[in-house]
Design a protein with these regions (language model features):
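Terminal transmembrane helix and immediately flanking juxtamembrane interfaces
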Residues: 1-159, 170, 175-182, 212-244, ...
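Juxtamembrane/interfacial segments flanking transmembrane helices
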Residues: 161-167
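Alpha-helical transmembrane segments of helical membrane proteins, especially in multi-pass transport
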Residues: 187-210
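Alpha-helix N-cap/helix-initiation motif
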Residues: 191, 247-248
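Extracellular acidic loop/turn motifs
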Residues: 193, 353-356
């Protein structure tokens, strides 16, 4: 499918066009609470919303830094998809096969990208546009904190998408002509754990409940109850779509749930402290000595686990497959552009019993040849060999190939596309980049997650202690 502004531009246009109408729909019973657009600049200045804008810009840069680390670290970290597969098997394949329908695929693919970006953008904007600065703060913090918490798992516990590892499962979203360029530019396809498509909206739901409990308001009487229902409905859709589209394992949602709780407690506790900081000073947001001790303890313990277990650990064993494909299946791995002058060293090892054929070629040649996880009608793997290519790699069981691929342009990249004509092929595809020694900075980027976790443990334990004392007083 061709469209001049692509999926991201289309989705952002939808988001911008629907923001005010949806705000008006959700506040139809209280129009007096709406902020006039002409008053928005003054509201931004008076409520200090400039830091929200700065936060989103910082988040964009931080994500770019993490993405820059992801692939180079894999040569030392490897992946753990085989562990997840051993745990839950091929259950998600059933979800795809039982409900597969072209119209459903189109709807869920658009929903997967649209609603996630919509929740990131709309929820804090909605709270700003209905003059609720407390919830606007918490929603903006939720986006930043939940991603920060996910960084250690993204960098040091790689899990491939289900469609790359379950034979017979198609990448209904990722291997499609309209999405493939956007996806290969923005998603390494091995950040299965945790699922932030599940964790981010769940964090908002938990924040909503903590807020209502603090205010003494029943959730059903909260003025933003309809927004809460909107998020709940979309969370339910995500639970199905991430399996149906060949993206997430069910297991991926569990760390997402855990991070959502940690994130929600952090945002709920620190929002008023951050909001009052200009008047009370920096000392007002400093954690207790116990909180600092727990943050340091978590940082030391988790950093040690990364250094001693994750790096050159069980995920990096050369005989462990990170791609599995059945007869007629195809898998795609992206060769990222990290340097215009230094080639990427690519190694493909056949660690299974059946042979496989791989071709390495530039994405621009094949972007229109995929449709809903498969080749377009009338096109097959052999047609790829008609394009200019870097290398064709036929591999029988036990064979490996190692070579260099140039990345001369930031406007295009190369893809490793592999195919199995018979039997279940198991491959290990690894790449070495010029900046592959990023272990130290990767660990540094993970430290905020460990610090936040330690601080939340301190706050949560103190809250439980206070509630216990209150209950004892009531009983007495």
């Amino acid at each position: 499918m061709w469209w001049p502004i692509g999926p991201y531009g289309t989705i952002m246009a939808f988001i911008l066009a629907s923001t005010i109408p949806l705000r008006n729909l959700l506040t139809r019973d209280e129009p007096e609470e709406r902020l006039r657009l002409s008053d928005l600049p003054q509201e931004i200045r008076s409520k200090g919303y400039k830091w929200h804008i700065s936060l989103y810009l910082a988040m964009y840069l931080f994500k770019a830094v993490i993405d820059h680390h992801n692939e180079p670290l894999k040569s030392r970290v490897g992946g753990y998809t085989h562990w997840v597969h051993q745990l839950e098997g091929d259950f998600t394949l059933w979800a795809q096969e039982a409900f597969r329908n072209d119209l459903l695929t189109e709807a869920l693919a658009f929903h997967y990208l649209f609603v996630y970006l919509f929740i990131i953008w709309f929820v804090p904007i909605y709270f700003i546009l209905v003059k609720d600065h407390v919830m606007a703060d918490k929603a903006a913090l939720n986006y930043l904190v939940v991603y920060v918490l996910a960084v250690p798992l993204y960098l040091f516990f790689n899990v491939e998408v289900t469609s790359s590892f379950i034979p017979g499962m198609d990448a209904l979203l990722y291997h499609d002509s309209w999405y493939i360029e956007f996806i290969t530019n923005n998603d390494p396809l091995d950040n299965g754990i945790p699922s932030l498509h599940f964790g981010l909206p769940l964090g908002l739901l938990i924040i909503n409940r903590l807020h209502c409990r603090e205010m003494g308001i029943p959730l059903k009487e909260w003025r933003h109850r309809e927004l809460d229902l909107f998020i709940i409905i979309n969370l339910g859709i995500y639970l199905f779509s991430i399996q149906y589209l060949g993206i997430h394992w069910i297991t991926d949602t569990i760390p997402g749930i855990i991070l959502a709780f940690i994130c929600a407690y952090f945002c709920h506790h620190w929002q008023p402290l951050l909001r009052d900081r200009p008047t009370k000073g920096w000392r007002s947001i400093m954690p207790s000595s116990r909180g600092i001790a727990l943050a340091v303890a978590f940082s030391v313990a988790c950093t040690s686990a990364i250094a001693l277990v994750a790096i050159d650990g069980p995920g990096s064993e050369e005989d462990v497959a990170n791609f599995r494909l059945g007869p007629g299946d195809l898998v795609i791995d992206t060769i990222e552009v990290h340097s215009l002058n230094h080639p990427v060293t690519v190694e493909i090892r056949n660690v299974g019993e059946f042979g496989s054929l791989c071709v390495i070629l530039e994405r621009t040649h094949v972007v229109s040849d995929f449709e809903k996880g498969r080749f377009s009608n009338g096109f097959d793997f052999n047609d790829l060999l008609e394009y200019p290519y870097h290398q064709v790699v036929p591999l029988i069981s036990g064979e490996s190939w190692r070579g260099e691929v140039e990345t001369p342009s930031i406007l295009d990249t190369s893809l490793v596309i592999c195919h199995s004509s018979g039997g279940i092929s198991e491959l290990r595809i690894s790449m070495e980049y010029v900046d592959d020694e990023l272990i130290f900075t990767g660990i540094l980027a993970s430290l905020p997650a460990f610090i936040i976790t330690g601080l939340v443990v301190d706050v949560a334990s103190r809250s439980e202690g206070v509630e216990g004392e209150d209950s004892a007083d009531v009983d007495a």
